[in-house]
Amino acid sequence: MTILSHILGFPRIGLHRELKRAQESYWDGHITQQQLLNTGRELRACHWQQQKQAGLNMLPVGDFAWYDHVLTTSLMLDNVPVRHRNDDGSSNIDTLYRIGRGNAPTGQPVVASEMTKWFNTNYHYIVPEFTVGQQFRLGWTQLIEEVDEALALGYNIKPILLGPISYLWLGKAKEKHFDRLSLLSALLPVYQQILALLAQRGIEWVQIDEPALVLELPTAWCNAYYDAYTDALQGYSKLLLTTYFDSIGHHLNIITNLSVHGLHVDLIAGNDDVEVLHRTLPSNWVLSAGVINGRNVWRADLPSKFKQLRSLVGQRELWVGSSCSLLHSPIDLSIETRMDPEVKSWFAFTIQKCNELKLLCNALNRLDDTKYQAILADYSAPLWARQTSEKVHNRQVKIRTEQITENHSQRQQHYLDRINVQRARFNLPILPTTTIGSFPQTTAIRSLRLDLKSGRIDNEYYKNAICNHIKQAITEQDALGLDVLVHGEAERNDMVEYFGEHLNGFIFTQNGWVQSYGSRCVKPPIIIGDISRPKPITVEWAWYAQSLTQKPVKGMLTGPVTILCWSFPREDLDRKTIARQIALALRDEVIDLENAGIGIIQIDEPALREGLPLKYSAWKEYLTWAVEAFRLNAAVAKNNTQIHTHMCYSEFNDIMDSIIAMDADVITIETSRSNMKLLDTFKQYQYPNDIGPGVYDIHSPNIPSEDDIIQLLRKAAQVIPIKRLWVNPDCGLKTRTWLETRKALSNMVNAAHKLRREEEYNRS
């Protein structure tokens, strides 16, 4: 039996972010819809060719998406909210954009659907909306069209479908007490229709993704797998039931009773034993072993992968693949021309990971030919050399980390005592207005950074120019009447990458882009060694901004857990220790900001929830060290220094005790798309500290009206005492234009002023 290689998905953005540029050009009216569609077709053809050249046996189709693959699935199932529908009931790419971002070149602006994190990754998906009695039908046929494209090019393909149970799990019911699982019977006929269309095209295998199977699911959801995968989806192409991001051993009793033809298991994030899987799964099933890490950039230890799988060779049909979609990996290491050659030898990006699968397949298919095993050893040799590299180990960091005590994580006084001191210091009005940190990253700002890196300008010119942008941001905020200001973060390319550039233990790529959501891409830093701070990072900019105004200016830090979660971490050190190292480095930054006269310091932790293990039984351990890392970072602050934190894309009802334990003086959160429903949790738990619920959605170009914001603030005031309410957008304003920013913030400030006057009148 020949071992085959495949991946669960290929990055869709293009080597040079062609998809991002095409979409934004289309949104801005610079290219036509047909030109946009042509770009997508060219990218898909290029990606298939790259995979074929890398030696993969089967190529995925259906991994391409214009905004998000979950949103694509919604359109395929005709699950389009009424507010987003075209007048004639049809769906097209503009429908997709209205759902995802609230705006498209055609149709009217409308509230976008919610966006949240894809399991515990830094990728975002658009949350499907479900209603009572909802019907489904085959809508957008992008998948079928892409299958036809790939077949016409002569490729051996494996279409991808997001499975019906996971699709329902990932969505949200719009009515209270409505069980979205009840829609399964209405959903399955559409899946049958899709599978029939694929079978008609001669498709042998379909990858049907059911990542929800790695979770600790309620009984009803477990039982639903029998309904979906016994008879309903049979009689078409063979189904590869695909799981990722964790182990599936706890659900093997369910999986083995389903009428599928193979199982893919993530053997990187999960701890499933391949021998147990082999003994447990039906003998006629394919076992697809996800042994190449789809979520990190490190070169694989191929000899250990070979050892892990060799006993299965000849025992059953075996495929080797990526642990998950390579959506989460940069595309090609070979174009990184400035990276230290030693460090570069430690990595593998998407193209290189495909090659790793080919090398592993070659060795497994030729067990008797030792030269192929020698090739594996030669390939992985740089990983073993890394173990003694001076770029990895810092004894002083290790000593400092080992000396951490419980006292390092405790503020001097309780919040109720601190807040009185802080209110006396800052003398802010009720409903104080602020922003989350960043202001628009204009072409001029991005050009400055590019010119500095290319040597076209010197550091002095760059600093003066950044100071001018900071001055503009302060002037704009003063003119708008905001109460607590920010310096605007003109010097920052990305909230994580910027800090990584100024900390020892990180390295950076030129083109290591991955998709975050829609057209937004990020270039995560890579943690290669022990972390320390050689000198202050943000103090110079914060001090300058504060010198321009009498109003308080926030110092802006990215928290240790977020830096960890949004970087590619090292694989030879546990996450708790890495987070502690980052926290200690940023702790020193808090001290220096205070010494520079900065009285409000925001430590953003938007990734706190996404770092949660997928299995609830492992949450306590993670939350303990994650909260400790935040407190280790923040607790050094004086009592009259106000610590803020920001979290977005989060649901807090099941981690509220940990949010309270963080002991931030003020927390700002994303709530506008959920219409302030998130605040019910804060009321239920009697959240004791100040809170700023986001009053408008910065991910959409739509401008909120004063009345919209007032309505949201009134809802918030019913849940949170008004003396503890702050007024702010959902998130940073980096991706918005100045025109959008001025209009939205002006309406936000005016809304706050109106409610202040009402409150003063009611008190008089």
UniProtKB/Swiss-Prot annotation:
Gene3D superfamilies attached to this UniProt entry: 3.20.20.210
EC numbers on record: 2.1.1.14
Pathway membership: Amino-acid biosynthesis; L-methionine biosynthesis via de novo pathway; L-methionine from L-homocysteine (MetE route): step 1/1
Binding residues for L-methionine: 436-438, 489, 604
Binding of Zn(2+), residues: 646, 648, 670, 731
One Pfam family linked to the record: Meth_synt_2
Domain of life: Bacteria
CDD domains in the record: CIMS_C_terminal_like, CIMS_N_terminal_like
Entry keywords, A to Z: Amino-acid biosynthesis, Metal-binding, Methionine biosynthesis, Methyltransferase, Repeat, Transferase, Zinc
Cofactor(s) needed for function: Zn(2+)
UniProt binding sites for L-homocysteine: 436-438, 489, 604
Catalytic residues of the enzyme: 699
UniProt remark on cofactor binding: Binds 1 zinc ion per subunit.
GO BP terms, alphabetized: methionine biosynthetic process; methylation
Catalyses which reaction(s): 5-methyltetrahydropteroyltri-L-glutamate + L-homocysteine = tetrahydropteroyltri-L-glutamate + L-methionine
InterPro entries associated with the record: Cbl-indep_Met_Synth_N, Cobalamin-indep_Met_synthase, Met_Synth_C/arc, UROD/MetE-like_sf
Binding site for 5-methyltetrahydropteroyltri-L-glutamate: 17-20, 117, 520-521, 566, 610
GO molecular function terms attached to this record: 5-methyltetrahydropteroyltriglutamate-homocysteine S-methyltransferase activity; zinc ion binding
Protein family (similarity comment): Belongs to the vitamin-B12 independent methionine synthase family.
Annotated PANTHER family: 5-METHYLTETRAHYDROPTEROYLTRIGLUTAMATE--HOMOCYSTEINE METHYLTRANSFERASE (PTHR30519)
Role summary: Catalyzes the transfer of a methyl group from 5-methyltetrahydrofolate to homocysteine resulting in methionine formation.
The protein, known as: 5-methyltetrahydropteroyltriglutamate--homocysteine methyltransferase
Source organism (scientific name): Baumannia cicadellinicola subsp. Homalodisca coagulata
